[in-house]
Amino acid sequence: KRNLILSPAFKEFEQNANPRTREKLRYAISILETVYPVPTKFVKKLVGTDFFELRVSVDNEIRVILFAVDNDNINLATNVILLNGFVKKSTKDYDKEITKAINILR
């Protein structure tokens, strides 16, 4: 089982989600926490960054959670830091959210 660390920004994102979205987020996070290897259906490495994204689809909207791990290979990681989350509206959202994630890690 992987150790989850939740940033204040992630906790706020989760608390502000409606109950159905929160339930789906928790399900996806439980997979990230317990399933080896991590299914690529849920998780992708963000090219050119140290971050991964966990995607959850709810009511035709995609929620993205940015996270970091303690190993270059996610399947060997023991610690996962959930940094921040957002509703994906366009690919432009990523730059702003990646900057936020970098600042949270500091």
Which residues are covered by each model-predicted region?
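Basic, Lys/Arg-enriched alpha-helical interface segments
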Residues: 1-62, 71-79, 87-106
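Conserved catalytic cores of phosphodiester-cleaving nucleases, focusing on short active-site segments
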Residues: 83
